[in-house]
Amino acid sequence: MIVKPDKMIRVVLDTNVLVASVFYRSPFYWLWESFLQKEYELCVTSDILNEYAEVIERRFSINVAESALEQILSSPNIIQSTRYFEWNVIEKDPYDNKFFDCAVAANADFIVSEDKHFNILNRVTFPSVSAIRMEEFKQILQKNKKV
């Protein structure tokens, strides 16, 4: 995987990945903490933000959802994009196409997800967006810290 020390990495986080990372006792809290420490740029659309809020509220509470969204929206390393085209690449879960569309619109380097249906993206040649797992993204962030 290519590490880009000359620019901040741009990623789209699948909702399950983000939700797994926001609780400070989570083993995946490093992902949220890395965002707060501006180690990568998070690309979102209004659809993605709405889904984040809905799922965080369902899993935790409305207060946690509001706090997380406030932190995201006030961060300087947030890239708010608009979907201009629907690619419909992910057939197994069409609702997840919003993450691919956002990645294309924001020129993201990766989509971080644990869902296997995102693996199809690694076979799509145009537009090209790589899907990686959380552990792989963690390794990329660690390499960037050393550069």
Regions found by a protein language model. Give the residues of each.
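Extended, non-globular alpha-helical segments
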Residues: S46-L73, I140-V147
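Metal-dependent nucleic-acid phosphoesterase active-site entry motif
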Residues: M1-R25
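Alpha-helix capping/helix-boundary segments
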Residues: V17-L18, I48, H117-F118
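PIN/NYN-family metal-dependent endoribonuclease catalytic core
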Residues: L13, F23, Y29-E57
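Hydrophobic/aromatic ligand-binding patch that stacks against planar heteroaromatic rings
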Residues: S34, C102, R123
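Active-site neighborhoods of divalent-metal-dependent phosphate/nucleic-acid chemistry enzymes
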Residues: N77-I111, K116, I120
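A secondary-structure boundary/capping signal
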Residues: D14-T15, V44-T45, E114, R133
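Acidic, PIN/NYN-like endoribonuclease modules and their adjacent C-terminal/linker elements
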Residues: K116-V147
